[in-house]
Amino acid sequence: MNNISDEVLEIEGLYKIVHLQKFRETEGVLFEVFPKEFLENVSGVDKVIHRGNAVSPGKIGDVERPWYMHPFQWDNLIVLKGKRYIDLYSVKHGKKESFIVTPDEIYHNGTLICNSAGILTWPPYVFHRVESKEEGSASLNFAYRYDGFDVKDNF
C-alpha cells in the first residue's frame, strides 16, 4: 500500500513523522529500513515494554495523568507491537496534540496521517505522556541525548 503522504509531516518544535523506507518484500516478510540520516545522531536505543493499561509517567500524588519532558533528550519512537497513545504539548505550540502509533499506522487527533511504518519524534522540552490500553505495547526509542543528560533526572 502506498503511504498516505510520503512528505514530511511535522509541527516544527513539537513533532515530526519519519517514514521507514521499504527495502524488500518476500512472501509474508516485509523489510523496512530507517533513513541513514535519521540514525547519525542516535546515542541510545531504549526498548520499552508496556504491560496492559500502562501509563507513563505514572500517577504522581493526586495527579492521575501527569506529563514529563526531557531537557536533554530528543525522542524517536517506533511501535513494534500494540498501540501507543501519546499526547504532546509545548509551550510555544500552546495546545495538546494526540497520536495513536501502531506498527503500521499513525493517527493524529483521530485522523490517519501515515499508513505505513513510521517514527514519531519530538524534541527536548516537549511535554509528553504515553499510555497503552489492555493489550499493552512494545517500542524502541532511538534517543538523541545531549550534554547535560542524566538518567537520574531525565524522567
Where on the chain are the PLM-derived regions?
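Active-site region of the double-stranded beta-helix
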Residues: 1-114, 134-155
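Histidine-centered metal-chelating micro-motifs
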Residues: 117-130
